[in-house]
Design a protein with these regions (language model features):
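Extended alpha-solenoid helical-repeat scaffolds
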Residues: 1-367
């Protein structure tokens, strides 16, 4: 009705009628009414409950079924919530943080975190309250399916909540029975929890997980890169182990390592790491088969050629093989990176590369 004739609905007092329906004893009616009001009032910033209505819903929601409970909680937060109402909500709903249904717990946690965002003392208390709750769920063998949703939420949680989880870092070490989604979410979050004292343990744990599916492998290498670049004392250890993986089974790991090698910022190595980095690059290039490489891995190859061509035996041969590839589907970035890498090789080996450089320039002049 609203979408067809909004003006008529306003004239007939639809909004007022819907607000009165929020006192209906049936939870499903209340849920659908909230949703409808939110759509109708979208242009005005959506539904905003006054204190009286929020208190009424709070008194009723504690007896709702899980689905309606979670739905109504999404509407209990408002910029207009004062401290008295905030405390009322916190006190009334606190027991639901211990609810066995993860969706109920997470709905309450999300609401609480919004409510106390600008109240320092309440926020400190809430951090202490929700941390063991989150840890308990993540440690549970019966919550594996739900834990993906919890992990998704805490990926973007504020830093003080993350800090409180640092002492529980092992909870984020993936378990064999975890689903692939949960494994990836845990691995992606691990770098946020790592400090110097736990970095090496986290790195070794992730390395020992391998091999996994390609998605998990890439998540591992991306998180290793984040840890190795933030905790410099672990950088060499990470690079050496990546090289060992390539030497052990380059077919299994080359593409996955190439997908993440730029994240390791190996062009910014220190003098003490020089030998290990160069050996790592040589091992990558020795394992490389240009004819079978995925197009998405080429940017990493260009990166290595541009920064390490002086360490790669006959780099012009790699350039030549790449130029023989079908480039019809390449994005502009690939062409520019190929030109940049070829130029670096040309500066190093002008006699061996001048014909290739000329062909490339002619190709791009006619594109």
């Amino acid at each position: 009705m609203w979408r067809h004739s909004p003006a008529a609905c306003r004239d007939l007092g639809l909004v007022s009628a819907l607000y009165s329906m929020l006192r209906d004893p049936e939870p499903a009616v209340v849920s659908f009414t909230l949703q409808t009001l939110n759509v109708i009032l979208e242009a005005e910033g959506g539904l905003r409950l006054n204190r009286k209505m929020a208190s009424h819903l709070l008194s009723r929601v504690v007896s709702y079924r899980e689905k309606e409970f979670c739905f109504v909680l999404d509407f209990l937060h408002s910029p207009d919530v004062d401290e008295e109402l905030t405390l009322e909500i916190l006190n009334s709903l606190d027991p639901f943080l211990d609810h066995p249904d993860g969706n109920v717990m997470l709905s309450v946690a999300k609401l609480f975190i919004k409510l106390v965002e600008k109240n320092t003392s309440l926020r400190i208390s809430l951090v202490k309250r929700v941390t063991p709750v989150f840890v308990g769920y993540l440690s549970s063998s019966t919550q594996r399916e739900f834990n993906h949703h919890l992990l998704e939420y805490i990926q973007n949680i504020d830093q003080d909540y993350v800090d409180s989880l640092m002492s529980h870092i092992k909870v984020f070490f993936p378990k064999n029975k975890d689903t692939e989604k949960v494994k990836i979410a845990k691995i992606n979050f691990l770098p946020n929890l790592v400090v110097e004292d736990t970095a090496m343990e986290a790195i070794n744990f992730m390395l020992n997980l391998l091999p996994q599916s390609r998605s998990v492998n890439i998540a591992v290498f991306e998180s290793l890169a984040r840890i190795c670049t933030s905790e410099k004392s672990c950088f060499a250890h990470g690079i050496v182990n990546l090289e060992l993986l390539l030497k052990t089974d380059s077919d299994a790991y080359l593409e996955d390592i190439l997908a993440c090698v730029i994240l390791f910022q190996i062009d910014q190595y220190s003098e003490s790491e020089c030998e290990k980095v160069i050996q790592f690059v040589k091992t990558i290039m020795k394992s490389l088969k240009v004819s079978t490489i995925k197009t998405c891995s080429l940017l990493s190859v260009f990166y290595l050629l541009e920064h390490f061509s002086y360490n790669i035996p006959q780099p012009e041969h790699i350039i030549e093989d790449i130029m023989d590839m079908d480039k019809s589907t390449w994005a502009t970035e690939y062409h520019s990176q190929l030109l940049s890498a070829t130029y670096q090789v040309f500066l190093l080996r002008p006699a061996a590369t001048q014909i290739l450089m000329g062909k490339l320039l002619i190709l791009y002049l006619h594109m």
